[in-house]
Swiss-Prot record:
The keyword Phosphoprotein does not apply. It is found in: Cytoplasm. Pathway: Carbohydrate degradation; pentose phosphate pathway; D-glyceraldehyde 3-phosphate and beta-D-fructose 6-phosphate from D-ribose 5-phosphate and D-xylulose 5-phosphate (non-oxidative stage): step 2/3. It comes from Polaromonas sp. (strain JS666 / ATCC BAA-500). GO terms for biological process: carbohydrate metabolic process; pentose-phosphate shunt, non-oxidative branch. This is Transaldolase. The gene is tal. Belongs to the transaldolase family. Type 1 subfamily. One of its GO terms (molecular function) is transaldolase activity.
Length: 315
């Protein structure tokens, strides 16, 4: 049994890609997309017709609507291959506007429903800002399930749990990147690998908190830099993994044991934690890594959304 097969015994495997032609070989349950992944896909010759067809079909419509329709088109193609759910992201430029994020998420789901997709097969991705979390809470009350992304800190996870969102995506690799860059020449790769990886430690803390306190929100580790980060989180509810790392896992016959366990988490002695808006903003501000990576992530996704719009205009 290879490592990918072993991982599927403990964890729901999710493919992190817009390149849906790669999905079949790995047989993931779910898939995640974001503007950066869709931008990467539409620049490939295989997906140019899909871009042009969507733009031509909705010519004259507002650019933001055409972009949502393109994202939904990719999502529908993905859902024709996988048995589970696809995550589709709200424009990152709305990350600090709760009302606009809610409205955009609602529209994306309505576009899926118009294509015959059941609401339970779609997760609306929203950045885990305070405003994004409030938008997600409203969407959940409406019966629309959400995936809170760009999550780098414990306070973001706690607030998401309080809002009863469906799923969160802590970014393992980007946390690792920050600590490695900050340490500079003093960074010891071996000492910070596996269970000691700062990104892995962050997810473990969140997972243990959720399971200990019976919080139903699913934890999906994301943004991996190497297979070791993935295997160190075996047992996490879900892990979303790039095709390149899925291939590495499928090629490895090394043994894989469960690392995270809900039963063990329930027996831990952990303090109860809650955040109101003021406490959340202060806790996030106190976490330099999370503050920097959240801002950087929003800027990057927003920039790629603009590039995607430019490609649509030129198509």
């Amino acid at each position: 049994m290879n490592q990918l097969e072993s991982l599927k015994q403990f964890t729901t495997v999710v493919a992190d890609t817009g390149d849906f032609r790669q999905l079949g070989q790995f047989k993931p349950q779910d898939a995640t997309t974001n503007p950066s992944l869709i931008l990467k896909a539409v620049q490939k010759a295989d997906y140019q017709p899909l871009l042009k067809e969507t733009v031509a079909r909705f010519k004259g419509r507002a650019l933001d609507e055409v972009m949502d329709r393109l994202l939904v088109r990719f999502g529908c193609e993905i859902l024709s291959i996988i048995p589970g759910r696809v995550s589709t992201e709200v424009d990152a430029r709305l990350s600090f506007d709760a009302n606009a994020s809610y409205t955009r998420g609602e529209r994306i789901v309505e576009l899926y429903q118009a294509e015959g997709i059941h609401i339970d097969r779609v997760l609306i991705k929203v950045a885990a800002t305070w405003e994004g979390i409030q938008a997600a809470e409203r969407l959940e009350r409406r019966g629309i399930h959400t995936n809170l992304t760009l999550l780098f800190s414990f306070c973001q996870a706690v607030a998401c749990g309080q809002a009863r969102v469906q799923l969160i995506s802590p970014f393992v690799g980007r946390i690792y990147d920050w600590y490695k860059k900050s340490a500079g020449a003093a960074w010891d790769e071996a000492a910070n690998a596996g269970a000691n990886d700062p990104g892995v430690k962050s997810v473990r803390q969140i997972y243990n908190h959720y399971k200990h306190f019976g919080i139903a929100t699913e934890v999906m580790g994301a943004s991996f830099r190497n297979a070791g980060q993935i295997t160190a989180l075996a047992g996490c509810d879900l892990l979303t993994i790039s095709p390149e790392l899925l291939a590495q896992l499928a090629a490895s016959e090394a043994p894989l044991a469960r690392s995270l366990d809900a039963g063990a988490a329930r027996s831990l002695d952990l303090p109860a934690v809650n955040y109101d808006e003021t406490g959340f903003r202060y806790a996030l501000n106190e976490d330099a890594m999370a503050t920097e990576k959240l801002a950087e992530g929003i800027r990057a996704f927003a920039a790629d959304a603009i590039k995607l719009e430019q490609l649509m205009v030129a198509a």
